Amino acid sequence: MNAPRFAAPARRTKKLPPLRVGIGGPVGSGKTTLLEMLCKGMRERYDLVAITNDIYTKEDQRLLTIAGALPEARIMGVETGGCPHTAIREDASINLEAVERMLARFPDADIVFIESGGDNLAATFSPELSDLTIYVIDVAGGEKIPRKGGPGITKSDLLVINKTDLAPLVGANLEVMASDTRKMRGERPYVMCNLKALDGVADVIAFIENKGLLTV
């Protein structure tokens, strides 16, 4: 009797490796909404997969699946079981393994999105895990947020300031926030967004394409 044959793992056919985009920010700032909008805005042109992080659940994976951001098989939820910061920086092994598993399923993926669990302004991604980092804050957190600094504010490749529509309700001055952001970030870019209304999403997509050399 012949031994059973098993299909060899699919191999990547594209020359360039996939771009890994890390999305971080405090709880409730709009990370999952941004990821949803990016997937919906880029999935027709690029082969996408997404990894979400939660401490004790896979809630963000569920929300993205319900929203139809990507087919269910292309969204993987990771339960970190501890500090969200650790899982993307000091010991990113659980996320590195998730990336490896997703690329085994979809070897020709162009972009791997990795959404961190909600964390503070000190959160940063390990360079082993992410090629580009996007940090999301929101106006509802207060006009002072950009002035507080922290690696997420000052060192991320792109800062997204979300929920601009709430500025009048919380007494935040968007011009002051923009000025403070420029002082804290120097030449590093930022985008003012109202993600629910898709305002600013195109700018984030353009940044990913240009900075990630996807348009070359």
From Swiss-Prot:
Keywords recorded for this protein, A-Z: Chaperone, Cytoplasm, GTP-binding, Nickel insertion, Nucleotide-binding
Localization per Swiss-Prot or TrEMBL: Cytoplasm
Source taxon at top rank: Bacteria
GO CC, alphabetical: cytoplasm
Binding site for GTP: 25-32
One GO biological process term: urea catabolic process
GO MF: GTP binding; GTPase activity; nickel cation binding
Keyword Chaperone on entry: yes
InterPro entries: CobW/HypB/UreG_nucleotide-bd (IPR003495), P-loop_NTPase (IPR027417), UreG (IPR004400)
PANTHER family given in the database record: UREASE ACCESSORY PROTEIN G
Chain's role: Facilitates the functional incorporation of the urease nickel metallocenter. This process requires GTP hydrolysis, probably effectuated by UreG.
Subunit structure of this chain's protein: Homodimer. UreD, UreF and UreG form a complex that acts as a GTP-hydrolysis-dependent molecular chaperone, activating the urease apoprotein by helping to assemble the nickel containing metallocenter of UreC. The UreE protein probably delivers the nickel.
Family the entry assigns: Belongs to the SIMIBI class G3E GTPase family. UreG subfamily.
Protein name: Urease accessory protein UreG
Source organism per UniProt: Burkholderia mallei (strain ATCC 23344)
